Each structure stands twice: as C-alpha cells, then as structure tokens.
Design a protein with these regions (language model features):
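PLP-dependent amino-acid enzyme catalytic core
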Residues: 1-204
Length: 204
C-alpha cells in the first residue's frame, strides 16, 4: 500500500519530528528538560497531529496540540461541538493537501480516547458512511479536549499570513504552514508558553 496519511507506517516517522523539535529547544536553552510545549499542526486527515498525540503518549512533554484547518474546517467544528458532519460543500483552497472532509485518522484518536471501545468506534464510522454525521459521547470529547484545540484560516487569511511572515521575518512559508501560523497567532498566550508551528511543506 502507498505511504499516504492513513498508513500507520507514515505516522511512525512523523512522531520523531516532535521529539527532534523538543530536543532542539532544550539544546538551545529555550526550554528546560521536562517543560511542556504546545504544537500547532496544519492537517486535514489528522495524521501529523495524531503523530504528536502518539509522541505525548510516549512521554514527550506536550501541553496542547492545536489542529489547524483551512476553510474545509470539519475538524475545527468537530473539536468545538463534538459533532462530525461531512455534509457540507467541499472547498478548493490554496492549501490543497488539507482539502478533506473525511478525516480518516480521526478514527484512531476516537479508539484511544474511548478507552479502545471498538464497538463505539465501529458504530460512529458506520454512521459517517451511512448518514454523513455522528456525535461523539461527551465523556470521550472531554478526554480529547484535554489535549486538542482547533482553529482555521480562510484563503485570504492564509495569503495575509504568508505576506506578513515574509515582511516581518524574511521567512517564506507555504500555504499549509501559513494556515497553522494564522491559527497559532490567534491562540491566547500565557507567560512562559513555548509554542512550535509545524511546517509541513516547502515553498521551494
């Protein structure tokens, strides 16, 4: 099978990104060993951010994982409401790798957050196929929200973030990374918060 984002073989090496980023922060003296870090991840299929969750479960000190979506914000709506609803218009955006309405890796998170309740997960996935919508029990959503936040960026906001990042930092970022930076910039920041914006593609 191909190494697309539903393949667990792709998620496994992505886990190392989080440990490597954390190790670099420690080596540079930005954080102390054991200090928690928040990661913001541009994603449509929930693969890369799920790798971050795996890293946390393996012991990496992760404060929050922020799911950044484009205008196809099915994940943002899900994390806010507990309702996954793919019955919506599909938008073609300038961050096409995130143009997804059925986020296949979310099933893996539901399995873990529900205490490995295979009957529940199977029921929810069947609803997604037959009805296009499902509602996750509040107890499971509470577990998910202990780690995950979410936000989204429109194409105009994405373009503006690319422009402002270049003007202010002289760093050229691709549209997918810009989605994450836009979302991260709008999350309230506490004193001593350390945050990492994942860049998942290159503009070059």
């Amino acid at each position: 099978s191909s190494a697309n984002s539903i393949n667990i073989g792709r998620l496994a090496p992505q886990v190392t990104y989080y440990f490597d980023a954390y190790a670099q922060l420690v080596a540079k003296g930005t954080i102390a060993q054991g200090q928690k870090v928040t990661f913001c991840v541009p994603t449509g299929n929930f693969g890369d951010v799920l790798a971050g969750y795996f890293a946390k479960e393996m012991g990496l000190p992760v404060e929050r994982l922020i799911v950044a979506s484009n205008s196809n914000k099915v994940l943002t709506d899900f994390l806010e409401t507990g309702i996954y609803d793919r019955r919506r218009a599909f938008e073609k955006t300038i961050s096409p790798s995130m143009d997804i309405l059925v986020s296949s890796n979310l099933e893996r998170l539901l399995y873990l957050a529900s205490g490995k309740d295979t009957e529940l997960v199977s029921y929810l996935m069947n609803l997604l196929v037959t009805k296009g919508i499902y509602t996750v029990p509040e107890q499971v959503m509470d577990t998910i929200r202990e780690t995950f936040d979410a936000g989204f960026a429109t194409d105009d906001q994405t373009r503006e973030t690319i422009r402002s990042t270049w003007e202010n930092c002289r760093v050229l970022i691709d549209p997918h990374t810009a989605v994450a930076k836009h979302v991260l910039d709008r999350v309230s920041r506490q004193a001593n918060d350390v945050r990492v914006c994942l860049s998942t593609a290159s503009p070059y």
